[in-house]
Amino acid sequence: MRQADIVISGGGLVGLPLGLALAQGGLKTVIVDVAPKATILDPQFDGRVSALAYASVRMLAVLGVWDLLAPHAQPIHEILVTDGKAGRPASALSLHFDAKEVGSDSLGHIVENRHIRMALYEKLAGAQNLELVAPAAVKSLAITDSGALVTLTNDETITAAVTVAADSRRSPLRSQAGIGVVSWSYPQIGIVATVEHEKPHNGVAYEHFLPSGPFAILPMTGDRSSLVWTEAQAKAPALLGLEEKSFNEELARRFGSHLGRTKSVGPRWSYPLSFHLAREFVHLRLALCGDSAHGIHPIAGQGLNLGLRDAAALAEVLLDAARLGRDLGALDTLKRYERWRRFDCLAMAASTDGLNRLFSNDIAPLRQLRDLGLGLVDAIGPARRFFMRHAGGDVGKLPRLMKGQAA
């Protein structure tokens, strides 16, 4: 039987940074992941990227990961938000964010997920107090007042003070614990693709609000951008089934000509859009983190940043408890994490849901109202700067890691 302080179920983009933070703080941590290591470390480009807010970048820098990622990261210097219809000029009222206005050289970075994974695993390989068990999954979890007994699918057992579920939106551990969720589906599909274009993007990200949903163009390294295209469920299958020439024509109708000729390269991904929020984030000796706790609409590109804030807060709570000699898995210890994170997650979920409902329609009075709103925010400097700081993850009670300090 193996002994650890913490067992993390899920070695993804939230579970790995959490494990590194805990291990660097001196807690013996085991990460369990269902995917074979060869799959996790596959260097092939799969088209998926993440937007990292600058608070998340500070966290990764403290963990020693950012130096490995920086050569693969594209800074976002500006963001332009417009409203309109496919194939027509955008509204004259728009919203423009510029990093220089908040004294920064970027509002965040776009990084391919494969590079994030490989950088995290490179740090994991040389870390003390940290071990990866893969491929394996948690088969059962037995909770007592004195500890947690984790049984894996390879029949190995681990005792720990705390088990963390960072194991996807359909978290098996969350289900085992009987923690319910509030959830609903959107009548939309997310289409993800990579686009090559003639002209340089100059680090500018675009978000076009179309009647079917947001159409985001995120700058990548080189003359490439990642496309996050929200489309109505009824139309998405036909678009996904188009041959390359026809797909690029549909792309151009929405993309515009500001970057010259464009073409889709690499695989296209699609996924149904939904919302969920766990009714509880903690039980005795169990904490939910990242997608296991919440899932939001991608309209603001904040999903990973929200999960990294979970990881930073949970690491701080557990390391503080360890320094004070407290029981890491006691309910009062873990409730501090829940109180800290629940409001932020609920507020982000509500705002992304509201934005999607406001902008994903073609009702003329609403369209005029939202265009006016974009223009007003653009005209009011303090409001513009507030939204930029919010997008950068620099508001509210930040965990130490998000401030660039050790947990």
Regions found by a protein language model. Name each.
Residues Q44-A86:
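N-terminal FAD cofactor-binding segment of flavoenzymes
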Residues A23-F45:
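Glycine-rich FAD pyrophosphate-binding loop
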Residues P272-L288, L346-A347:
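FAD-binding beta-loop-beta segment adjacent to the flavin cofactor pocket
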Residues A4-I31:
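N-terminal Rossmann-like FAD-binding beta1-loop-alpha1 element of flavoenzymes
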